[in-house]
């Protein structure tokens, strides 16, 4: 269908978001046009502010507005454990259960040989650097139960084993192919409690 150029551009912009197809992008574009000028300005302002003000924590790699982030600077956290996740959304999911009190490391991606993504393409070197001369005695791998998540998990385990650091993996309460960010709190709690050593 032929839309006026401004609407077509808006549809194109929305369709670049993950999980947004052409129909949803069209609905969002038309809804945005129907919003009040004040709401559209607030939306645009918030979007620009988030893009401008957010950065990655120089310690853990989590998306934050403070560097280092609030978790890395919290002295009450257990500094002997680091939970490794794919992205910042996974940290939020784990924090919701209010059970894990250790630190995090965000990989900002997964090793994916099929997509040409290797260990050097994700935030892995900084994890290894963090572990040198630290009090960490356990690294808990909490990547998603996908082929790329498993490949990443096995790689991290192989790299860290010679250093004598205990490497564990979340227990299988998470269905294969599922994302941590969508798991319910009870499933995540059981996965942490029943983690297995690699």
From Swiss-Prot:
Gene3D superfamilies: 3.30.60.80, 3.40.1360.10, 6.10.250.240, RecR Domain 1 (1.10.8.420). Pfam families: RecR_C, RecR_HhH, Toprim_4. Residues 80-175 form the Toprim domain. A zinc finger (C4-type) spans 57-72. GO terms for biological process: DNA recombination; DNA repair. GO terms for molecular function: DNA binding; zinc ion binding. Keywords: DNA damage, DNA recombination, DNA repair, Metal-binding, Zinc, Zinc-finger. InterPro entries: DNA_Rcmb_RecR, Rcmb_RecR, Rcmb_RecR_Znf, TOPRIM_dom, TOPRIM_RecR. It comes from the Bacteria. Belongs to the RecR family. May play a role in DNA repair. It seems to be involved in an RecBC-independent recombinational process of DNA repair. It may act with RecF and RecO. This is Recombination protein RecR. It comes from Streptococcus thermophilus (strain ATCC BAA-491 / LMD-9).
């Amino acid at each position: 269908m032929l839309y006026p150029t401004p609407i077509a551009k808006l549809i194109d912009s929305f369709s670049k978001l993950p999980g947004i197809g052409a129909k949803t992008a069209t609905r969002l574009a038309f809804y945005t046009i129907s919003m009040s000028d004040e709401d559209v300005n607030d939306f645009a302002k918030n979007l620009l502010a988030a893009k401008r003000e957010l950065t990655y924590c120089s310690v853990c790699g989590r998306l934050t507005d403070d560097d280092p982030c609030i978790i890395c600077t919290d002295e009450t956290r257990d500094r002997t454990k680091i939970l490794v996740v794919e992205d910042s959304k996974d940290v939020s999911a784990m924090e919701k259960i209010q059970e894990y009190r250790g630190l995090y490391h965000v990989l900002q991606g997964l090793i994916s040989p099929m997509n040409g993504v290797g260990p050097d393409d994700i935030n892995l070197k900084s994890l290894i650097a963090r572990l040198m001369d630290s009090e960490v005695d356990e690294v808990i791998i909490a990547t998603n139960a996908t082929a790329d998540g498993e490949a990443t998990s096995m790689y991290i385990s192989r790299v860290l084993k010679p250093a004598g650091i205990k490497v564990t993996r979340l227990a299988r309460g998470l269905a294969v192919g599922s994302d941590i960010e969508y798991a319910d709190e009870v499933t995540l709690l059981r996965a942490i409690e029943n983690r297995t050593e690699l």
